[in-house]
Amino acid sequence: MAQVFNFSSGPAMLPADVLKQAQQELCDWNGLGTSVMEISHRGKEFIKVAEEAEHDFRELLNVPSNYKVLFCHGGGRGQFAAVPLNILGDKTTADYVDAGYWAASAIKEAKKYCTPNVFDAKVTVDGLRAVKPMREWQLSDNAAYLHYCPNETIDGIAIDETPDFGNEVVVAADFSSTILSRPIDVSRYGVIYAGAQKNIGPAGLTIVIVREDLLGKANIACPSILDYSILNDNDSMFNTPPTFAWYLSGLVFKWLKANGGVAAMDKINQQKAELLYGAIDNSDFYRNDVAKANRSRMNVPFQLADNALDKLFLEESFAAGLHALKGHRVVGGMRASIYNAMPLEGVIALTDFMADFERRHG
């Protein structure tokens, strides 16, 4: 079978070594004669899986001891509701920074539970899309927390600054598409959440990192399955968790550790992004309209000079083993998502194809 590279934004490519191990263990896990999908989440065998996964995740991100790690349902959209329901307390407003599609989606959901103070950070610089630096963000005095999305998958926009708004500001961030791709100073945040389907594992699992002093403030109307305190008190097993996704994510964590951890991912992700953006910038046939300071290393959108060639580009790239390059319906064009599991060889194959396509159709 020819090599296929999956550039999907999520569910995304998983490490080949992880898939092979899961395949080998699928019908007889740990010599039990059953699949890990079939065993009880409360049995000692799965409890060990869960504990190892949390331990490895904490180690990878150097999560401080005063933070809890929760393995949840609901995805990022579930957390759009969970954050205000858990963190507002007796306040009625929160600061939300709008830098793209997913930040706007979080704002829309938050309006059901509070009055968001929305700061539009989107700007245009020399004809390119950019984001205002954090020092220019206008925050309110009475907000329960500040929410932002460090990486916008659809827009290909990243906010790489580390927040430094003082100890009184609780920062909540949607790290769904950038978690584990580079080091994070977890201590600068009150809440970090991430859907698994991009850099962690398969869809169906969401991980929340929450500072323990923020627990116990949930709105009385908060569904129990979204209540951070209840999830923490029950070791993320208040109800049956997505056990297979949890197990696979644990394998990904071990793969990351075996391959140098987050620091190594940071380095290779920078290489991949520089290679792909270089191919775009050095061409008159392709273009990216995001300012260099805000370009995402995970999601690289690009347009062809003649969008009449889009369909042909997608057909030929798919035939060449380069899958899921179609841009999001909101922005069109192309998009290459190059998360941790995407090897450098995949990006090289893509840039080689782009150069060949340009020679033939430019």
UniProtKB/Swiss-Prot annotation:
CDD domains, per the entry: PSAT_like
Residue numbers of N6-(pyridoxal phosphate)lysine PTMs: 198
Places the protein is found: Cytoplasm
InterPro entries associated with the record: Aminotrans_V_dom, Aminotrans_V_PyrdxlP_BS, Pser_aminoTfrase, PyrdxlP-dep_Trfase, PyrdxlP-dep_Trfase_major, PyrdxlP-dep_Trfase_small
Annotated binding of pyridoxal 5'-phosphate, by residue: 76-77, 102, 153, 174, 197, 239-240
The organism's place on the tree of life at top rank: Bacteria
Gene Ontology CC entries for this record: cytoplasm
EC numbers, comma separated: 2.6.1.52
Cofactor comment text: Binds 1 pyridoxal phosphate per subunit.
Keywords from the UniProt entry: Amino-acid biosynthesis, Aminotransferase, Cytoplasm, Pyridoxal phosphate, Pyridoxine biosynthesis, Serine biosynthesis, Transferase
PROSITE patterns in the cross-refs: AA_TRANSFER_CLASS_5 (PS00595)
Top enzyme class: transferase
GO molecular function per UniProt: O-phospho-L-serine:2-oxoglutarate aminotransferase activity; pyridoxal phosphate binding
GO biological processes: L-serine biosynthetic process; pyridoxine biosynthetic process
Catalysed reactions, semicolon-separated: O-phospho-L-serine + 2-oxoglutarate = 3-phosphooxypyruvate + L-glutamate; 4-(phosphooxy)-L-threonine + 2-oxoglutarate = (R)-3-hydroxy-2-oxo-4-phosphooxybutanoate + L-glutamate
Pathway annotation from the record: Amino-acid biosynthesis; L-serine biosynthesis; L-serine from 3-phospho-D-glycerate: step 2/3; Cofactor biosynthesis; pyridoxine 5'-phosphate biosynthesis; pyridoxine 5'-phosphate from D-erythrose 4-phosphate: step 3/5
Cofactor names: pyridoxal 5'-phosphate
Major location (coarse): cytoplasm
Residues engaged in binding L-glutamate: 9, 42
Function, in words: Catalyzes the reversible conversion of 3-phosphohydroxypyruvate to phosphoserine and of 3-hydroxy-2-oxo-4-phosphonooxybutanoate to phosphohydroxythreonine.
Family affiliation: Belongs to the class-V pyridoxal-phosphate-dependent aminotransferase family. SerC subfamily.
Assembly and binders: Homodimer.
Protein name: Phosphoserine aminotransferase
